């Protein structure tokens, strides 16, 4: 890789560290190309990305940002990142259960070092979409109750008229 390309890649990684709220580093040795592609697709669907990184360049990018130095950059490493806190840990841990050769080695949350325990805790949280769905269903409860209450007299009237017609016959 040319020196100019390396500098460009370091700037790219610095941008990821600055802008992504959650970064999870994975050791992907032993995964097939198809498996990595599937992980990328699932991450992309949820608004996240996966990038294979060169360890020395990743270390330089982390050092430039004055983030606490971590020893997660050794061996074949990829980083999954997103602005959403929950998406990346959920997807990566689901694939880690599915593919034993995929190992989560650490990460960053809000530019602070995250342990495996931190990542597991984030993955256990509900997504923002489920929170939005719960909120919307709560908003619908009064509307449903109003519809039921306003509809009840009509149903009673129809029942009375039906009984009246049946008694006349």
Swiss-Prot record:
InterPro entries (UniProt xref): Ribosomal_uL10, Ribosomal_uL10-like_sf, Ribosomal_uL10_bac, Ribosomal_uL10_bac_type, Ribosomal_uL10_CS_bac
Pfam family, one: Ribosomal_L10
Cellular component terms per the entry's GO annotation: large ribosomal subunit
GO MF annotations, alphabetized: large ribosomal subunit rRNA binding; structural constituent of ribosome
PROSITE patterns from the UniProt entry: RIBOSOMAL_L10 (PS01109)
GO biological process: translation
CDD domains, per database record: Ribosomal_L10
Keyword Nucleotide-binding: no
Keyword Transit peptide appears in the UniProt entry: no
Keywords: Ribonucleoprotein, Ribosomal protein, RNA-binding, rRNA-binding
Family the entry assigns: Belongs to the universal ribosomal protein uL10 family.
Database matches in PANTHER family: 39S RIBOSOMAL PROTEIN L10, MITOCHONDRIAL
Description of how the protein assembles with itself and partners: Part of the ribosomal stalk of the 50S ribosomal subunit. The N-terminus interacts with L11 and the large rRNA to form the base of the stalk. The C-terminus forms an elongated spine to which L12 dimers bind in a sequential fashion forming a multimeric L10(L12)X complex.
Name of the protein described by the UniProt record: Large ribosomal subunit protein uL10
């Amino acid at each position: 890789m040319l020196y100019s390309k390396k500098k460009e890649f370091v700037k790219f990684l610095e941008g990821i560290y600055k802008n992504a709220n959650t970064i999870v580093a994975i050791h992907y040795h032993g995964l097939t190309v198809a498996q990595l592609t599937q992980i990328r697709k699932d991450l992309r669907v949820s608004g996240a990305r996966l990038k294979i990184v060169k360890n020395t360049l990743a270390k330089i990018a982390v050092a430039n940002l004055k983030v606490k130095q971590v020893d997660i950059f050794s061996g074949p490493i990829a980083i999954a990142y997103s602005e959403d806190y929950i998406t990346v840990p959920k997807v990566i841990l689901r694939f880690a259960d599915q593919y034993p050769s995929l190992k989560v080695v650490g990460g960053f949350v809000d530019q602070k070092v995250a342990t495996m325990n931190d990542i597991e805790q984030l993955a256990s949280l509900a997504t923002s979409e489920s929170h939005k769905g719960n909120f919307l269903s709560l908003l619908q409860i009064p509307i449903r109750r109003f519809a039921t209450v306003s509809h009840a007299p009509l149903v009673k009237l129809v029942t009375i008229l039906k009984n009246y017609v049946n008694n006349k016959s």
